[in-house]
């Protein structure tokens, strides 16, 4: 079993939904939690609710300068959990290129940017825990899920490649593939 007490975990994409819930869980387990997202107000409110030492650092995963500033401000961590996500439901018949591009940029390319700034330090220290949030949709295409499913297939593949490259080091890589969780993102669905 993992010992969380005294560990520093950075949750990126933690202002709501799964990230917010995980911040509470890790806090109850004794971890020092650093939460990040774009919304400073939501992050500040979350930090005030957490039961242990917690702080926040704003980050925009679409902006490499914002990522680099956040990495510098946060400093070395025992673990990083990438939960940042964007979602708009639409399918091939009503293609929305701007939304598709944003989903891929936040969900996949943002992950690549963050890992590029975090992983080298973990490899140098031969220590770290990386958790990447993908989705069950990464395994099979779904109606009205063009950009999201493609981006999550990419996050799954990236996580598997990182695990293959780092499995014999002190850096542990995990991927989680949640099913349907009701969040502000999934509330956009109009299931029939």
Residue ranges of model-derived segments:
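Catalytic Tyr-X3-Lys loop
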Residues: 86, 93-113, 155
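Active-site helix of classical SDR
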Residues: 115, 151
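Conserved glycine-rich Rossmann-like NAD(P)H-binding loop of the short-chain dehydrogenase/reductase
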Residues: 29-46
């Amino acid at each position: 079993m993992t010992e969380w007490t005294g560990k520093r975990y950075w949750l990126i994409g933690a202002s709501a939904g799964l990230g917010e819930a995980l911040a509470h869980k890790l806090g109850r387990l004794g971890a020092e939690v650093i939460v990040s997202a774009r919304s400073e107000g939501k992050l500040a409110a979350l930090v005030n609710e957490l039961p242990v030492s917690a702080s926040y650092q704003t980050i925009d995963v679409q902006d490499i300068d914002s990522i680099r500033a956040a990495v510098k401000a946060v400093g070395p961590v025992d673990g990083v959990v990438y939960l940042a996500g964007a979602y708009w439901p639409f399918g091939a018949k009503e293609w929305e290129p701007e939304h598709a591009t944003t989903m891929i940029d936040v969900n996949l390319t943002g992950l690549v940017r963050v890992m590029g700034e975090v992983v080298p330090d973990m490899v140098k220290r031969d220590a770290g825990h990386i958790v990447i949030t993908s989705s069950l949709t990464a395994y099979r295409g779904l109606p009205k899920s063009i950009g999201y499913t493609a981006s999550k297939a990419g996050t799954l593949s990236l996580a598997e490649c990182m695990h293959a490259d780092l499995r014999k080091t002190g850096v542990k890589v995990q991927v989680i593939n949640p099913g349907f969780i009701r969040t502000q993102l999934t509330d956009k669905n109009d299931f029939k």
